[in-house]
Amino acid sequence: MRLFSLLPLLALLVVQAAGQSEVTSDDPATDAGSTTNSTTDTKPRIPSQDEILGQMPSINPIRTGNPQMDAFYMMFPALGSLLKWGSLFPAYSILGAIPDNLQPTAAASKVVLVLADDATAKTRVARQNPPPNPLGQLMNWPALPQDFQLPSMDLGPQVGSFLAQLPAMPTVPGLLGAAAPVPAPAPAPAAAPPPAPAPAADPPAAPVPDAPQPAILGQAALQNAFTFFNPANFDASSLLGQSVPTFAPPNLDFVAQMQRQFFPGMTPAQPAAAGTDAQASDISEVRVRPEDPYSQEAQMKIKSALEMEQERQQQAQVKDQEQVPLLWFRMPTTQNQDATEEKTLEDLRVEAKLRAFERQVIAELRMLQKIELMAKQMRSSAAAQNGDSPYRISYPLSRTPIHKITRADIEQALRDDYVRRLVNKEAQRRARNSGINTQKANALKRQAKSQDQTLSKEDIVQIMAYAYRMANEQMESEKGKQDKVYAAYRTEQNPMMMQQRQWSEEQAKIQQNQQQIQQNPMMMQQRQWSEEQAKIQQNQQQIQQNPMMMQQRQWSEEQAKIQQNQQQIQQNPMMMQQRQWSEEQAKIQQNQQQIQQNPMMVQQRQWSEEQAKIQQNQQQIQQNPMMMQQRQWSEEQAKIQHDQQMAQQMAQQGLMMTEQRQRQWSEDQAKIQQAQQMAQQTPMMMPQMQQRQWTEDPQMVQQMQQRQWAEDQTRMQMAQQNPMMQQQRQMAENPQMMQQRQWSEEQTKIEQAQQMAQQNQMMMQQMQQRQWSEDQAQIQQQQRQMMQQTPMMMKERQWAEENPQSVQQQGPMMMQQQMPSMMQREVEDEDNKAEDDLVGEAGPQMPENEGTARHKVDALGVGGNKRKKSKSKSAPPTVINYYYAAPQRPVVQSYGTSYGGGGYGSNAYGVPRPVNSYQSQGYRAAVGNDEVDEMLRQHQTMARATHFRQ
């Protein structure tokens, strides 16, 4: 963020810093510990961005009561706030309700506002009456029917006989009070027979048949434990009278639970009172959360399909939240100036807090990466000591970039014991150091200072909401830019699509014009004329910009115009004749302008237009022969004018060719005079110049012959044009179709011949200019070589001037010796031009060593030193250094003892070693063809074997 966008904050910070500096400047000890190292506080200084972000409020660590979590929150307050309140500011939940499972557990209030149309709320459960308690229903049901009465039965003899069979027991009167409740299940067998005659449809009789089992168990217990009872101690009637009122209710709670679990639909429900049965309404509601958020009934409730889908969506959201990077709120570093100026002061403050929070999160993530890397080293060393594999647990956090770290990565890192231990130790150390530092600070600073402000949960949620809003705005703007760029790219990459679009637009315009013509013909004629004039101007501009594209478009437009003309001829023939005459006049003017601008393109276009005109003429002859005769006469008049213009152009070209011939003849004369002057200056180089002129003369003869042949062809064509034009007039008078077709074919042939002649003339002109430039370059090169002669040639020239008679005697001998070698060299040069492997002339390797660098010369042209094997099998090309040799002593003829024919080991041309040359016998100075020829004139040992290429 740029500095000028925080001007209000900067002003406040400067005033605050100035106020603090006035207070603390008296004490040197306190000034030493300040962050700013300024010694003079007379002039206020604008703080840097780092200082501004450093003065942002800190974050309160979260207190949970768990020592390990408290240590983590103390070490990483920003990360802890992100992990704790992460459900508040990701993109999908910041505008909706907060799920209960992601909310903080210590809620301030149990009252929750729920919107009825909110589909993301987990607390949205259909409100209904509590299910009835089956145990209460069972207790409300009577155990026996209301009309049921026990029959009068004397059970005394039966019980007495049963007890009489037991062994005799001593009478224990003290146990009567305690023993009376114990045999309470005993009267159950007496109650078993009466329900048998009752109807089977009576529901209260269902649980009664389960009672005999506890009764039998009770009899066995009585037989073993209470054998001391006898019939004398008990009376059956009194026993029944005491036990029936004190009948304990059976514990049927487990039965009700099983029934609710396995048969939820069979639970009998009491009808609720009127007005109490209410499902979730369509309006907002206020509900009170229950004490136990996970009640037993809510867990056992069978969920509907809608709730299952909602849970599935919430699980997907939680999974996405695990994969969202923690730094999703990262602000872009570059912003437009207009965007920053439009922000309000509150937005600027929130953005400053957001940037400070972002920097703190990045610093904490880097610290956590270091801790995880240290834990990895500790685990690997411990595993190496124990012989275990150190790669059993992966540590991906240290390898992940900071802007890609997610919540799942941090949770996986915190599962490791070593990471948790290191975090706890670091938190303890920081707690000790922070306590000492706060004590020192409180002891040193005696000024009144307010408590440091901290970022609360509301502040963090606010800055996250701002980041989410900014990210949405940036995403929309970037999407708009990308759409524009992509649209432009598609139009550039697909010209066919653009052509189709233009064609469709033109078709729509044509249809619209036809409709308007039918409605108002007079107005449409004027409008069409103005549109055609505008199109003609637009076409001329586009032809200058892009000729190739305009040709295709013009062809399509002409096809559309031809169809439109045919339709209009059928509708109104008289009006179309006048309009066609005006169009043809405009086309003739347009063709003349295009011929002046671009003749080659216009020729191709004329051929296509003539083909279209021929077809159109045939159609019109069939429709209206009288009108076509008049039109043909006007076309012939236009063609006659066109032919006259072409004849004038050909005459001008003939004049230009004659001027060019005269100019070339004068240039040749200048060359001959210059060659004669050079021959007079350097008599030693005369044979070479004569031979070169001898090779150039056939070329000049051929060029002159070609020019004369081209001129003869043009004259023949001009002579043939006049009788052809007369024949065309005679054939135009005859309205037969065959004569017109032949006449058009002959016109096309004549135009093709003219085009070929013009192309040949242009090619000849280019060849002549190229040859003239090459001759000029060769003459300049010879002049340079003449100026750069060796001191030896200067001495020879002086000697020749002093002794002209001896020079005249040696001249014919030198010519006779040199002519065979020069002829052989020229023939070989002409034969081997295609096989020339000379890459280029060597440039100066070092400027301070220019003129002394030497290259080993390949004398026989076989390519390189064969004693050294290179990586590539092909021989390197020959490189010749043409630099002027350094001044040295004259050549001394020393034949020595070697007669090897001038190879690398030969001493046939033993030259004393120059001062700055390489210290090797195989290097010789090859400074150009002239110096080598001079050596060959004096020593003819290698005259026929050496082949230097130019």
Swiss-Prot record:
GO biological process: chorion-containing eggshell formation; egg chorion assembly; response to starvation
InterPro entries: DEC-1_C, DEC-1_N, DEC-1_REPEAT
Post-translational events: Proteolytic cleavage of isoform FC106 generates 2 further products, S80 and S60.
Sequence repeat copies, ranges: 493-518, 519-544, 545-570, 571-596, 597-622, 623-652, 653-680, 681-696, 697-720, 721-733, 734-758, 759-788
Polar residues bias: start-end ranges: 32-41
Biased composition (Low complexity): 268-280
Protein name: Defective chorion protein, FC106 isoform
Species whose genome carries this gene: Drosophila melanogaster
Lineage per the UniProt record: Eukaryota, Metazoa, Ecdysozoa, Arthropoda, Hexapoda
Originating gene: dec
